[in-house]
Amino acid sequence: RDNKMNLEQKDRIGQYLRPHLGQIIFDELSESYLERAGLADILRDVPVPLRKTELNNITTLTIARNMAFVIGVDPAFQYRDNYIAYILRAFDKRFAEGLIADGVEWASKNDFDYACIQFRAAFQIDPENADAYYCYGRACKDAYELGEEEEFIGRFKAESLEAFEIATIKNPQLAEAYYFLGYGYVNMGLYVKAKLTWEEYLKLTEGRAADGIEELRQEIRGRL
C-alpha cells in the first residue's frame, strides 16, 4: 500500500476546489527583491500568488499562505515544488501545523472546501504529518455526508478512506483514524477489514478515560 497520497497524479476532488483559485492573481517578485531576500534560486521567473484583497500588504507570511492555498487546490500546479521550497526556507515544515489549525477552524464552520485545501497543503509540506491526513479524512467525510450528487459523494468517500488509511500508516497510535477507517470499510462492504481495524481501535483506546471514549468503545463493541 502506498504511504502517501499522490494527489499530483490522482486527484479525486480537485475539480470541486479549483474555482477557488479565482481569488488569486499571479505576479513575479522583482529580481532585486529576490536577490536581497536570498530567494532568487527558488523564485526567479516563478509567478507568485497574491490575493486581490491583500495587494497592499504583501509579506513573507501572506505569500507562503497563498502558495499553500494554490497547491492545496491544485497539487499538480506547475510551480508546486518551488512553492514548497519557498515555504520550507522562509519557515519550515512546522508551517503545516498552522495550516491544519486553519483547516480545523474552516471545518468547524462547515466550509469543507477551504478545510480540505488547508489539509491538502499541509501534507504536501510535511508528508509525515498524520494529523493532516486524519483531518483531511474527516473533512472529506463531513463533505460527502452533506453532499447530494452521486459522483461528488463517491469521490469524497474514496478520498476520505484513503486519507484515514494513510493516517494510520503515518501514526499507528492514532486511535481516532482507526475508528473512522472502520466505518469507511463497512461502507464499502469490507467487513473483515472493518473488524480488524476496529479491534485495533479497541486495543489503542483500552484504559483511556478521555471524554466520550467509553461510549465509542461500546458502540464499536456492539458492531463487532
Regions flagged by a language model, labelled:
Residues A132, A177, D211-G212, I220:
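TPR alpha-solenoid repeat register
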Residues T53-N56, N82-I100, I213-L224:
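TPR-adjacent "capping" and linker segments in tetratricopeptide-repeat scaffold/adaptor proteins
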Residues A122, I166-A167, Y201:
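Canonical positions in the second alpha-helix
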